Regions:
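Short helix-loop-beta junction
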Residues: 37-43, 241-251, 467-475
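Short acidic, glycine/serine/threonine-rich loops at helix termini
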Residues: 34-37, 60, 81-85, 107-114, ...
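Conserved thiamine diphosphate
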Residues: 104-153, 159, 186, 194, ...
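Flexible, low-complexity linker and terminal segments
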Residues: 1-8, 12, 130-338, 343-344, ...
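A glycine-rich helix N-cap at a beta->alpha junction
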Residues: 43-50, 91-102, 184-187, 427-438, ...
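Thiamine diphosphate
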Residues: 1-133, 161, 224-225, 283-285, 369-507, 517-518, ...
């Protein structure tokens, strides 16, 4: 049956049809929906792991147990999982194991623009790269077969446009292979030096076998048309090339590691001028040049930054550009902002007022760095804020009382706990704030270990942030739970904890305003006669407030009656809503 699917749904369908039994992932745009769609299949066990490293390690365990297993993560998540990834190449598999990584060219929702193809080469793992939803489904199924044939995890790489674009797929029934028996084999699975040195030989043999395989497999194909110009490309870039130059000859790469160098060489001999079109790093181009294949152009034309497009490809080639129509007026800008009623707004307003140095982290709250809040000083990676604050305060102890670190509840579980342990163990004196909004918010409301619910909405033990911190050695009297919508109380508690000569944890606890069970109040009302146009309330960054004609106005369609703006108004011009 033919269906229209986004790439992520097609990957999930592929692992379902391949008989995958076990999926463990951590949410990360643009990969999140793969695991959410997989959870919709009753035959597939799917879970949110505490982080990507845990997810991959769990999937390796499921593979050794004899079940086809899968994990998905965004590109920076693969950094977290890199430790088990490299050794998993040595250990190999029992049943098939597929590791999907979703890159984010143009940095739509990430902190960097890294190219994950390098991981395949560095870890010596085969990597497939689909160019549409149909290939997402087909390549996922084939990846399990490759994994079992060559006794290796197989990587599947997508990018944002493939993950979130729709195209037709042909679905089929699920074929579930029986569980493979687990046989103890210390010479394979126990990766200590004496074993690993032997397994390295096996890894190199597998890669050599895969180099032969990629020269004949149908993941890679030659599309001969006009021989005057030829393109070597893969993934989303293939779609741009085909639309920009429909009459050109193309060598489409589906297995990006190992590359089919000899087939590319043969294709190069058939065209007059050869170009390489790929997003981000010159991964394919570098390999071709190293093999002595003459290239008329590549990254010197397309550049290293951002996404490609049909327009950019034609422009890079010096071709005429299609006519465009200019709108009479530009659309208004829509900068990313926190939602109306967001519990983080109150906290960040307090932090901004106190003029503290604030070490930030990854999540919705990263938006606290933007105007008008301007509350965050740094953002590095998941879980970094507590550790960065520790280093900062150790070097500049006189500033320790004027600095805090913030991270979210899901991020705390992901990689924040170790920061608390490190701070306590190394006699740090810092104030760490956990923003507990009862959900993993930025990636679309996923459950996490602090919510008491699994991915499949099964009740689970609720991990208590306060108890974890106390167990890590933070004095119980220095662990405070505060409602961030009470800005006066938050200010008081912050000052108290900053004054202490011991580590402190403040849990800023209020559920995300978008959660279905959260009850909202009536929209607030503005008394126009009392409003002085001072804009103090506008510093909250609430999208339900706007300033026009010298006064503040409320968008009743957005206002949830949280009352934060009432607390900021010195003229009592903002009142509770009335039915």
């Amino acid at each position: 049956m033919k269906e229209l699917m986004i790439g992520n749904a097609a990957v999930a369908r592929g692992l379902y049809e391949a008989g995958c039994r076990y999926v463990s992932s951590y949410p990360g745009t643009p990969s999140t929906e793969i695991t959410e769609f997989a959870a919709g299949y009753d035959e597939v066990y799917a879970e949110w792991a505490s982080n990507e490293k845990v997810a991959l390690e769990s999937a390796v365990g499921a593979s050794l147990a004899g079940a086809r297993s899968f994990t998905a993560m965004k590109h920076v998540g693969l950094n977290v999982a890199a430790d088990p990834l490299f050794t998993a190449a040595y250990v190999g598999v029992n049943a098939g194991l597929v590791v999907c990584v979703a890159d984010d060219p143009a940095i739509h929702s990430s902190q960097n623009e890294q190219d994950s193809r390098h991981y395949a080469e560095a870890a010596k793992l085969p990597m497939l790269e689909p160019a549409d939803s149909a290939e997402c489904l087909a390549f996922t199924k084939r990846a399990f077969e490759l994994s079992e044939t060559y006794d290796t995890p197989v990587m599947l790489r997508t990018v944002t446009r493939i993950a979130h674009s729709q195209s037709l797929v042909e679905t089929s029934e699920r074929v579930e292979p029986p569980l493979r028996p687990y046989v103890k084999d210390a010479q394979k699975y126990v990766s200590m030096p004496a074993v690993a040195v032997k397994r390295h030989v096996v890894v190199e043999k597998h890669i050599e076998d895969l180099r032969k395989y990629t020269e004949t497999c149908d993941f890679n194909r030659e599309e001969m048309r006009d021989p005057e110009i030829g393109f070597v490309t893969s993934g989303a870039a293939y779609q741009y090339v085909r639309e920009a130059f429909p009459n050109a000859s193309v060598f489409k790469i589906g297995m990006v590691y190992p590359l089919p160098i000899e087939r590319i060489r043969a294709f190069a001999a058939k065209v007059d001028r050869l170009y390489v079109i790929e997003e981000l790093d010159p991964f394919i181009e570098t390999a071709m040049r190293a093999a002595g294949i003459a290239i008329a152009g590549g990254k010197d034309r397309t550049g290293l930054l951002g996404e490609l497009s049909q327009y950019r490809v034609r422009k890079a080639m010096g071709a005429s550009l299609p006519p465009t129509k200019t709108l009479g007026e530009n659309l208004p800008g829509r900068p990313p902002v926190m939602c109306a009623g967001c519990p983080h707004c109150g906290l960040f307003t307090v932090l901004s007022r106190l003029k503290l140095t604030v070490f930030g982290d990854i999540g919705c709250y990263t938006l606290g760095a933007t105007p008008p809040l301007n509350a965050l000083d740094t953002t590095l990676c998941m879980g970094a804020s507590f550790n960065m604050l520790h280093g900062y305060a150790t070097v500049r102890p006189e500033q320790a009382k004027n600095a805090v670190a913030v991270l979210g509840d899901s991020t705390f579980i992901h990689s924040g706990i170790t920061g608390v342990v490190n701070t306590v163990y190394n006699l740090g004196v810092t104030t760490m704030i956990v923003l507990d909004n009862a959900i993993t918010g930025m990636t679309g409301h996923q459950q996490n270990p602090t919510t008491g619910m699994t991915l499949k909405n099964v009740p689970a033990p609720k991990i208590h942030i306060e108890k974890l911190c106390e167990g890590a050695g933070v004095p119980a009297e220095n662990i405070r739970v505060v409602d961030p919508n009470d800005m006066a109380e938050m200010t008081r508690v912050l000052r108290e904890e900053l004054a202490k000569d011991a580590p402190s944890v403040i849990v800023s606890r209020r559920p995300c305003a978008l959660l279905k069970y959260v009850k909202h109040g009536l929209p607030v009302r503005i008394d126009a006669e009392k409003c002085r146009g001072c804009r103090a309330c506008m510093k909250l960054g609430c999208p339900a407030l706007r300033f026009a004609e010298g006064k503040v106005w409320v968008d009743e369609a957005q206002c949830v009656g949280c009352g934060l703006c009432m607390q900021t108004c010195g003229f009592k011009a903002i009142e509770e809503g009335k039915a």
